[in-house]
Amino acid sequence: MTTANQPICPSPAKWPSPAKLNLFLYITGQRADGYHQLQTLFQFLDYGDQLTIEPRDDNQIRLLTPIAGVENEQNLIVRAAKMLQKHPGNTPVPRGADISIDKCLPMGGGLGGGSSNAATVLVALNLLWQCGLTDEQLADLGLTLGADVPVFVRGHAAFAEGIGEKLQPAEPVEKWYLVIHPGVNIPTPIIFSDPELKRNTPIRPLAALLSTPYANDCEPIARKRFREVEQALSWLLEYAPSRLTGTGACVFAEFDTESSARQVLSIAPEWLHGFVARGVNVSPLHRVRSGKIESSERR
C-alpha cells in the first residue's frame, strides 16, 4: 500500500505542457451547431508551461496552484484528471493526484495553453495511474474538453480539418519563432462571432496549402478589434513574415536562425513582451514520456 503523495511508479513528477502555433488557419464553413470548420497546420514549440504531478492513494484530485479568475472545478487540468479518473480501466492503482503548474503561457493567447495542460494531465496520469489507454483513446477523451486537446495528446505536428479533430501527421519546417503577446487577451468567441469573419475559404488539399503563402482568416478581425494586435503585427512585419496564431492574441514572426530571432526581440519596444522558441514536430511532452517509460523499464 502506498501513502499519499508517494509516487506509485518510478516516473519523475515534472511534465512539459508545450505551446502550439497555427502556422496557417482557414475557416471553411460553419456547422448548424455553431462550430466552425477549418483547415489548420499545428506545430509545437519547445516552450510552455510545466506541470508537477504527484499521485495520491486517496482518490483526491487537488490543484495546488489555482489560476486567477478560473474556478478549480472549471480548470481544464482538474476536468481532465477527473475525466480519466472515472474512465474504466484495468488498473489496481488508486487514482488521485496533487497537481501544480508553473504557468508562463498567457490565457487567451492562441498558444493552446489550457488545451495543452489538459493533454499533459491525460498523458501523464495515464502512465502514473497505469490506465493503459492508447493515445487514440486519450485523444477521444480530450476532444470532449476542447478541439485542440487531441493534437497535444497525439504529440505530432498535424494538419487538422473538421472542427480541428481530424488530424493528419505533418512535417513542417522546424523554424525559429519570435512570439509576441501584445498585452491583451482575446476570448475565442469574440473572433468566431464577428459577422465579418471570413467563413467560406475554399477547402484545398494539404499540398496546395503548403505551396502558397500562409495566412490566418482570423487575423483581420483581431487586427480590427484590438489595436494592440494591429500594432504588434505592424512592428513584427518590418522584420520577418508574421501572423496571428489561432484566434489570438499572440502573433509570431518566423526566422531561419535563433540568433536572428533574438536580435529582433532585443530591439522590441518596451510595450511588447515575447519569447524565442524553436518549432518542433514531436511534442516535448512525448519526448519526456518516452524517456520516462524507458527509465521505468530499465529499473
UniProtKB/Swiss-Prot annotation:
Catalytic activity: 4-CDP-2-C-methyl-D-erythritol + ATP = 4-CDP-2-C-methyl-D-erythritol 2-phosphate + ADP + H(+)
Annotated residues for binding of ATP: P106, M107, G108, G109, G110, L111, G112, G113, G114, S115, S116
GO terms, molecular function: 4-(cytidine 5'-diphospho)-2-C-methyl-D-erythritol kinase activity; ATP binding
Pathway the protein takes part in: Isoprenoid biosynthesis; isopentenyl diphosphate biosynthesis via DXP pathway; isopentenyl diphosphate from 1-deoxy-D-xylulose 5-phosphate: step 3/6
Residues spanning the signal sequence: none
Role according to the record: Catalyzes the phosphorylation of the position 2 hydroxy group of 4-diphosphocytidyl-2C-methyl-D-erythritol.
Enzyme class, spelled out: transferase
Subunit structure: Homodimer.
Positions annotated as active site in the UniProt record: K20, D148
Annotated PANTHER family: 4-DIPHOSPHOCYTIDYL-2-C-METHYL-D-ERYTHRITOL KINASE, CHLOROPLASTIC
This protein's UniProt keywords: ATP-binding, Isoprene biosynthesis, Kinase, Nucleotide-binding, Transferase
Family: Belongs to the GHMP kinase family. IspE subfamily.
A GO BP annotation: terpenoid biosynthetic process
Protein name: 4-diphosphocytidyl-2-C-methyl-D-erythritol kinase
EC number: 2.7.1.148
